[in-house]
Regions:
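Ligand-binding loop in jelly-roll beta-barrel domains
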Residues: 72, 110-112, 116-119, 125-152
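Short, conserved beta-strand element in jelly-roll/cupin
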Residues: 89-105
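Signal peptide processing junction and immediate N-terminal pro/mature segment
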Residues: 22-32
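Short loop/turn motifs at secondary-structure junctions and domain boundaries
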Residues: 33-36, 86-88
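N-terminal secretory signal peptides that target proteins for export/translocation
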Residues: 1-5
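Short beta-strand segments in beta-sandwich/barrel cores
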Residues: 84-85, 102-106, 120, 151
Length: 158
């Protein structure tokens, strides 16, 4: 069963990245090919008990890929347009990647993060006040959640 879950996680990850990169326009292809880093928005709980956001760079090895991270499963989610989830914490430490549609996360201080297709979030605010989420734009938001086996905050590929 674990073997099947791992395979599904890998297929989903590869599919998500291919979908993201395949959606690039011709003008963006050159930029995508010359990028040296993969960025993600880390949502974490600060010492004040509030959720905060920061942009992080995922560490890339000489093979142009991150080190392999163990996942415990994969979940695809469709969030209907207009859905709002009031203050909540992440259910576990996980990556969430927007595949289509748009969303928005709000953290402490009213800071809002726009979630466009291809946006990678590292959710680490599993305690404290949490964050809000909403589906915005013209269509449902489709995303993939990849729970990490290592639940140690701050250890994801950086």
């Amino acid at each position: 069963m674990r073997s099947i879950t791992r395979r599904l996680a890998m297929v989903a990850l590869v599919g998500a990245f291919l979908l993201i990169w395949g959606a690039e326009t011709d003008r963006d292809v050159v930029g995508a090919q010359t990028r040296k880093s993969i960025m993600a928005t880390r949502i974490y709980t600060g010492t004040d008990g509030q959720s905060h956001a920061e942009e992080i760079e995922l560490k890339i090895t000489s093979g142009n890929a991150s080190e392999m991270m163990k996942a415990t499963g994969v979940q695809f989610r469709r969030t209907p347009l207009g859905t709002f989830s009031d203050w909540h914490v992440g259910p576990r430490r996980q990556f969430v990647i927007t595949l289509s549609g748009r969303g928005e996360i709000e953290v402490a201080g009213g800071k809002k993060i726009s979630l466009e297709p291809g946006h990678i979030e590292l959710i680490e605010d599993t305690t404290g006040k949490g964050h809000t989420t909403r589906a915005v734009g013209k269509e449902d938001r489709v995303s993939i959640a990849i729970p990490l086996a290592d639940q140690t905050v701050g250890s994801a590929g950086r």
